[in-house]
Amino acid sequence: TGNDYVGGIAGSMGTASVAGLLNTTLGVASYLAFTVDNVHVNGAENGFTITGNERVAGGFGDTIGGSITTVSINNLASIEGNNLVGGFIGLSGPGDLAGADGGLTVNLLGLNYLLKLNNLLSLGQAIEVKIKDTNVNGINDGFTVHAKGSRDSNSVRDYSASGFIAKSGSTKVEDSHVTNLKSVKATDDGGYASGFVAISKTGGLADVADDSSIKSLIEANGLVNAVGYLIPKYTNCTVSFVNGGSVTADVAGGFAADFQSGTVDNSSRGTNDYYAV
């Protein structure tokens, strides 16, 4: 139980000294990505619950710039929060990090003075999250995910909940699965709910900083090499529901709700087993 950034493994994981991604000597080429390898969370037979406000998940509340390999969340019973609620990750990638809602800020001010254009590729690598061989397994009766937040009058804010990642930008997921999912719920006004990823979008520098000089630099020189690092990708990823499973929200889907960007490729499973749900 906590407020923001709540996870069964860690509340927030990111590149070391995120504000130091820009260095007067090394540019953005110098960064230290986080690594999580062979970590397992096992609940009791009747499961465990996680509650919080925003960025609440069975594994990590928030991740940016690193790799996660061979991780499992077992006997999960329920996850509940106001927004960005996920079975494994609440927010993955840059997402809303530059927002004024208490999120992390990647400091790219002065980019036009410090950044060498050939280091744009490194920036893409610095914010990318790679996930492999990771599973979220609910209790026998199934686990529930609920984003309780709702829009105030005149608000356009989105609320997301999902069995794996609530909001994904610049995330590459491979050989990862959700099992024994019972229900996923979000508000019927601006709510996004799904079995695997609620909102999938391309992470970009516009999400990281809003300085006009940065945008003009990007527009003039392009991000051709870095773009590949910013597009989400889901390879051999599946979700399975218990009998009577459900997804309820303004925008809802068995695998994804709002799939703005990304690719899904389950072809390695064979023609009889390549369905994601």
For each feature predicted by the language model, list its residue ranges.
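Surface-exposed loop/turn motifs in large extracellular/passenger domains
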Residues: T1-V277
